[in-house]
């Protein structure tokens, strides 16, 4: 019996979620402020120029561990903390869904720099959604030199492990909860 063309696509869509790392689709890796401090230290050690970026930014969100994976359909998720001028103000969750050619899984750390009060306010109100055109700078010895803000936002990532091949389209969405809020 010959199957119609769309059956393989349906089968792939059903099987793909089972291949995504559990960190990417579960509630996400948890983070604590001491882990965030260690990640910030690693970022600054790798590129000392980032110390000025941290100091000059109105705010930043640090996600110590983001899990990402997929086969055709992909997802990423991580939990972190949000700072305003170096002071802890809230928690955040990063969520990403992608579609396109992708195979594998990886784990990385991510810092989202918020240049000014407007960018920080958008983040806190849940209005910050990074589209496919937003690009992250991979942490190297001179990442700060390549860092460019787009709509008041810049992203730096540092690989922790894994291997991922991708030419996919998707965006990141962030949630925010102020420290001390119960709802």
Question: Across the structure, where does each feature detected by a protein language model lie?
Answer:
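Polar low-complexity intrinsically disordered regions
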Residues: 1, 18-23
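Small-residue-enriched, tightly packed secondary-structure blocks
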Residues: 24-183
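Bacterial N-terminal signal peptides that target proteins for export
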Residues: 1-10
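Bacterial N-terminal signal peptides
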Residues: 9-19
């Amino acid at each position: 019996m010959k199957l119609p063309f769309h059956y393989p696509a349906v089968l792939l869509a059903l099987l793909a979620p089972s291949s995504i790392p559990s960190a990417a689709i579960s509630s996400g890796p948890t983070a604590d402020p001491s882990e965030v401090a260690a990640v910030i230290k690693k970022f600054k050690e790798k590129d000392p120029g980032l110390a000025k970026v941290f100091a000059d930014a109105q705010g930043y969100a640090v996600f110590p561990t983001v899990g990402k994976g997929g086969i055709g359909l992909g997802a990423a998720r991580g939990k972190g903390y949000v700072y305003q001028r170096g002071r802890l103000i809230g928690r955040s969750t990063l969520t990403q869904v992608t579609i396109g050619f992708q195979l594998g899984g990886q784990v990385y750390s991510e810092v989202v720099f918020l240049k000014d009060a407007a960018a920080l306010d958008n983040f806190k109100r849940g209005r910050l959604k990074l589209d496919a055109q937003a690009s992250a700078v991979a942490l190297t010895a001179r990442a700060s030199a390549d860092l460019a803000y787009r709509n008041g936002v810049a992203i730096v990532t540092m690989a922790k492990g894994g291997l991922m091949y991708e030419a996919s389209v998707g965006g990141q969405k962030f949630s925010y909860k102020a420290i001390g809020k119960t709802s």
